[in-house]
Amino acid sequence: MANIKSQIKRNKTNEKARLRNQAIRSAVRTEIRKFHAAIDGGDKAAAESQLRVASRALDKAVTKGVFHRNNAANKKSSLARAFNKLG
């Protein structure tokens, strides 16, 4: 337990940020999971719409500072490759 007042405040702030980031990361992972489920189902239309949703979620997470932009770009690229393999 911190004794310094500023550190006590930082601990509170860090905990709030951790919970917020955790929720955003979880939402992004859920959208990516839905995309992979659509790919496994072989439904190209559903996969395309889910790809759009997952990409948007990743972009929003980057804007909020949860993911680094290069990390999100790599994830989006990986999703696009999986979609293109569906043919």
From Swiss-Prot:
Q: Record's Gene Ontology CC terms? A: cytosol; small ribosomal subunit
Q: Which InterPro entries did the record assign?
A: Ribosomal_bS20 (IPR002583), Ribosomal_bS20_sf (IPR036510)
Taxonomically, which superkingdom?
Answer: Bacteria
Full protein name: Small ribosomal subunit protein bS20
Which BP terms in the Gene Ontology apply to this protein?
A: translation
In this chain, the stretch annotated as Disordered covers 1-20
Under the GO molecular function aspect, what terms does this record hold?
Answer: small ribosomal subunit rRNA binding; structural constituent of ribosome
* Entry keyword set: Ribonucleoprotein, Ribosomal protein, RNA-binding, rRNA-binding
Extract the PANTHER family matched here.
30S RIBOSOMAL PROTEIN S20 (PTHR33398), SMALL RIBOSOMAL SUBUNIT PROTEIN BS20C (PTHR33398:SF1)
Traced from the root, the source organism's taxonomic lineage reads: Bacteria, Bacillati, Actinomycetota, Actinomycetes, Mycobacteriales
Q: What's this protein's family per the entry?
A: Belongs to the bacterial ribosomal protein bS20 family.
What is the role of the protein in this entry?
A: Binds directly to 16S ribosomal RNA.
Disulfide bridges in this chain? none
Gene name of the record = rpsT
Residue ranges annotated as coiled coil are none
